[in-house]
Amino acid sequence: MTLLKTPLLDTIRDAADVRRLPQDKLAQLAAELRAETIDAVSVTGGHLGAGLGVVELTVALHHVFNTPHDRLIWDVGHQCYPHKILTGRRDRIRTLRQGGGLSGFTRRAESEYDPFGAAHSSTSISAGLGMAVARDLSGEERNVVCVIGDGAMSAGMAYEAMNNAGAMDSRLIVILNDNDMSIAPPTGAMSAYLARLISGQTYRSLREIGKQIAGHLPKFVERGAARAEEFARGFWTGGTLFEELGFYYVGPIDGHNLDHLLPVLKNVRDAKTGPILVHVVTQKGKGYAPAEASADKYHGVVKFDVVTGAQVKAKSNAPSYTRVFAESLISQARHDPKVVAITAAMPSGTGLDLFGQVYPERTFDVGIAEQHAVTFAAGLAAEGFKPFCALYSTFLQRAYDQVVHDVALQGLPVRFIIDRAGLVGADGATHAGAFDIAFLACLPGMTVMAPADEAELVHMMATMVAFDDGPSAVRFPRGEGVGVERPERGEVLPIGKGRIVHGTGEGDIALLSLGTRLAACLDAAERLEAAGFTVTVADARFAKPLDRELVLKLAAGHGALVTVEEGSVGGFGSHVLQLVTDEGLLDRGAVKVRAMVLPDIYIDQETQARQLAAAGLDADAIVAKVEGLLGKAKAGVSLHKAG
């Protein structure tokens, strides 16, 4: 870690200290804040580029607005590291995304300066509008400021909220952090002058006087005058879209120029009417050359060398499940021109950047628009194509109605690739994929698979391409596989059939695993057998349709049956329990059945291994579960590993 010299930042305990600084000191504070952010993320890893892009904006907002009394909401949330440093959390900033440390996103439980938790995009304007209305109903005085950017304006929810806010005429301030200049670039001094002019009280007062005068004119003249004024401002500023939604538009402004930012923010702070949208143009990675040169690579980083920018990546023992999926899909697409791929603004995260390099015309990135992605895939499936819709488990939640109504109800063969299923490590509870088994396996006609290793994923990809009888899904975790050899071409698996991978199918205990918990089951089985138990281990492969024959065989042939899955209650284990109760096996006391699932809590950031241990889903927990069912070891051997 570099020994930084940050004399001005060292005087900042919270945002009140930022407000006490004279304006001519803010540029120095921003420079020191940027250096501190770079150094901290080099130690912990995390989201770097977005935070560097809003350093000046963060300083300006805390200087102008009376936070935390004024509500400041960040969206997506991962650009909040500079905000955390200025709001009393600098002493813990090098615990970002670590067990027991600061969250990588805003979090209500962490600080009063985080009025709303945000890790999924495009929620800020809706939440901010709710806070603004609550303020008005309570007769309070405060500003509500929503900072939205980093692609979040590609999601429909943001426009739904803006439409509502405009119709309600609520006093709400939205800062559009445009960090790819997708709408309009700032044009130097003229742009800054216009932004300052039209955000000021004089212009807004004259505008209101003009409206009152126009109100006494014939309606067609009044409408014409309003359109002319809107056109004139829209011509110079490019904000017509936001004006049509009912927002007063200001900008674009250079988001790295404090002399431009501060007067505009003061003007909108003091405005008595709203809503107002301030369009700020920033650069991701600003002030750190490697991040400026490669915004995509430095969006999210592991630990890195500050001087060179080189990221310290651990050597892989096996390919990631994401890569195995992508390479398998490419292989399948060579033989089937109907295979197409869809992602919602996550091409590199889902591996579809690799597919897109080979088949760009068959790859579709629809933006942060999961609802649209699913129904878009449904339309492709309706016309005979084979769409693979690749989403993180946590983001698939945003499109559940489309999964049910547009896909499952119509029996359309959309293939869902569910990445980051289960616990995800440093991104914590907001990005965990705990619920997909439960909310998919309950749907009629849905097929849900989970591979135990890389080879199984290759086979499941072949199965999905061949399966046209309805929607299907495969879920796999973040991170590397277990290192097994992958077949060149996958085999089509029989739908709804599992396999016994260890044992005879009869004995004291049967462990029935869904997905990658199979390795922990095999580890537990080895220790249980050393202690004198006879153990069968089976890989279910499918949560739905359930392999009834396999489940009933295991239940009939063992004194106890334990299911293991990296998912919430209501998933695979619940379906197994439903079957054995329907068959009356529990009535007769023929078998003891237990389901091992994620606990009914949100599990905070940690390493994945520690999260699994805390969740009670590692080999130690499986052994303990069997010990509780069947008693101590038969052979007098310890069931637990030494050390």
Swiss-Prot record:
Pfam families: DXP_synthase_N, Transket_pyr, Transketolase_C
Gene3D superfamilies: 3.40.50.920, 3.40.50.970
EC number: 2.2.1.7
An example Gene Ontology molecular-function term: 1-deoxy-D-xylulose-5-phosphate synthase activity
CDD domains cross-referenced by the UniProt entry: TPP_DXS, TPP_PYR_DXS_TK_like
Top EC class for this record: transferase
Keyword annotations from UniProtKB, A to Z: Isoprene biosynthesis, Magnesium, Metal-binding, Thiamine biosynthesis, Thiamine pyrophosphate, Transferase
Binding residues for Mg(2+): D150, N179
Cofactor descriptive note: Binds 1 Mg(2+) ion per subunit.
Binding site for thiamine diphosphate: H78, A119, H120, S121, G151, A152, N179, Y288, E370
One record GO biological process: 1-deoxy-D-xylulose 5-phosphate biosynthetic process
Catalyzed reactions per annotation: D-glyceraldehyde 3-phosphate + pyruvate + H(+) = 1-deoxy-D-xylulose 5-phosphate + CO2
Cofactor: Mg(2+); thiamine diphosphate
Pathway assigned to this chain's UniProt record: Metabolic intermediate biosynthesis; 1-deoxy-D-xylulose 5-phosphate biosynthesis; 1-deoxy-D-xylulose 5-phosphate from D-glyceraldehyde 3-phosphate and pyruvate: step 1/1
Record bears the keyword Lipid metabolism: no
Subunit and partners: Homodimer.
Record's function text: Catalyzes the acyloin condensation reaction between C atoms 2 and 3 of pyruvate and glyceraldehyde 3-phosphate to yield 1-deoxy-D-xylulose-5-phosphate (DXP).
Family statement: Belongs to the transketolase family. DXPS subfamily.
Annotated protein name in UniProt: 1-deoxy-D-xylulose-5-phosphate synthase
Lineage, opening ranks: Bacteria, Pseudomonadati, Pseudomonadota, Alphaproteobacteria, Hyphomicrobiales
Gene: dxs
